[in-house]
Amino acid sequence: MPSTLVLNADSSVCPALGTWIGNNAELLKGFSLLIAEDVLAELSKRNTLGQLSITSCRGIRSGGDIEMAATILKGEISGLIHFPSPTGERAGDVLSEPLVRPALLNNLPIALNPASASALVRGI
């Protein structure tokens, strides 16, 4: 099974994803992380991503969600971590549907908040 995770977040919850990454950096060292360029840029503003194995794909606004979805459909991803905005407000640049659907089709674990993301990387 591949050991690559897709990490993604709506703009309003990128800080929460960054905090979660920081709190789980040791666990994440065992994975390759696929993150869209624009999400990665937002995460890098507030967080040190240091020793993590990160591969970026094009930004969400440039079709990065589609690129990540294709990677999921090819069977190259072991899990999806996407933090959507809990208020239902969307930044307009990050969509979860193009990522969730291929993850469902490929029977991948999906995490939508810090608690489920921690469970996913711990193998629960």
Regions found by a protein language model. Give the residues of each.
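Ser/Thr/Gly-rich flexible loops in soluble cytosolic domains mediating phosphotransfer, phosphorylation
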Residues: 96-124
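General beta-strand structural signal in soluble alpha/beta enzymes
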Residues: 7, 34-36, 56-58, 82, ...
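Short active-site oxyanion
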Residues: 3-5, 26-33, 106-108
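Histidine-anchored nucleotide/phosphate-binding helix
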Residues: 14-28
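Short, glycine-rich nucleotide/cofactor-binding loops
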Residues: 5-15
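Active-site rim loops that border cofactor/substrate pockets in soluble metabolic enzymes
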Residues: 40, 45-66
